Amino acid sequence: MNYAETILPEFDREMANTRKVLERVPENKLDWQAHPKSHTIGWNANHLAEILGWVEGMLTATSWDFAPVGGEPYQSPKLTSWREILDLFDRNVAAARKAIAAVKGDQLTQPWSLLKAGTPLFTMPRATWMRSFVLNHLIHHRAILCVYLRLNDIPVPGMYDPSGDE
């Protein structure tokens, strides 16, 4: 069994669950935040939409410098409409799925590094990055967004079983 055959069923389930949550995000609450030190609903929704945009580069390049010396630092999207957020999410899901399906041989055991100004912050095998930096990271922010929805009396969709709202 290759990597795609083992990870894509889980990937598809988690992306469908994430989309269900993003579909509930109200545009009039994008600026809402639970605490002054917390990110807003909009920031979390944008982050969920962007995370999968990192997959192709992670699987094909050896590193990513999100703040290169002499270059422009990476900027997270700041989309302000529900439709734009969902469209970015859908595009990134499709691109990530295609990149995962194309993984060959020892590609996942090869190291990949996250850099800041040329300095490695972390270096791990690509498979570890996929699990922690992509899937676990996405599920973490999805859970935060679910709490934010709940705090705003917005029905939370079930992920693995029906939610208290279903």
Question: How should these model regions be labeled?
Answer:
Residues 8-19, 29-73, 114-166:
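Short, contiguous alpha-helical
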Residues 1-9:
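Short, charged, low-complexity loops and linkers
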Residues 76-114, 125-142, 147:
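Acidic/histidine-rich alpha-helical segments that form the ligand environment
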